[in-house]
């Protein structure tokens, strides 16, 4: 069990995602971006693609205050072969948020049309986002 939980990575479905610019505080209605560093911790190359419907991309679920349904976001539309052990920085655009409060964003990689990496044991990055009334 320990090997499966800590070392086994099916195919290329294991990555470490770290925030480059946290904590996040934004004003209502303001556009924002979140930069993350993605490190390939699998033993195979992760193939990012510029096409939206295929390949690997950065994906996120943005959960608003109050438990409403999350908004699904995508980024990382680049042609990039991320070798095992290599890292890259990607920027995730955040939509303007109208409601003040504490949001939560869960960031993962997604193999479009196949699986989110989390489904196969990779740990997503979860961060709070504080949204305050614009001055």
Residue ranges and their predicted role:
Residues 2-28:
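Low-complexity, acidic Ser/Thr/Pro/Gly-rich terminal tails and inter-domain linkers that flank the onset
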Residues 101-111:
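Short, surface-exposed ligand- or partner-binding patches at beta-edge/loop junctions that are enriched
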Residues 78-88:
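Short proline/glycine- and polar residue-rich coil/turn motifs
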Residues 38-42:
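Asparagine-centered strand-capping/turn motif at beta-strand->loop junctions
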Residues 94-101:
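Short, surface-exposed loop/turn segments at beta-strand-coil junctions that are enriched for proline
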Residues 46-48, 113-124:
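Beta-sandwich strand segments
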Residues 44-57, 104:
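Short, hydrophobic/aromatic beta-strand segments
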Residues 54-79:
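Short beta-strand and strand-turn-strand segments in soluble, beta-rich domains
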């Amino acid at each position: 069990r320990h090997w499966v939980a800590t070392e086994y990575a099916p195919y290329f479905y294991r990555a470490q995602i770290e925030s480059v610019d946290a904590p996040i505080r934004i004003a209502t209605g303001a556009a924002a971006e979140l930069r993350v560093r993605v490190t390939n911790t699998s033993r195979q190359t992760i193939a990012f693609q510029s096409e939206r419907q295929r390949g690997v991309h950065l994906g996120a679920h943005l959960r608003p205050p109050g438990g409403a349904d999350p908004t699904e976001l995508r980024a990382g539309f680049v042609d990039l072969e991320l070798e095992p052990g290599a890292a890259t920085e990607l920027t995730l655009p955040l939509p303007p948020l109208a409601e003040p409060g504490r949001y939560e964003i869960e960031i993962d990689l997604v193999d479009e049309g196949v699986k989110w990496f989390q489904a196969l044991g990779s740990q997503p990055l979860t961060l709070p986002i504080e949204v305050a009334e614009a001055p």
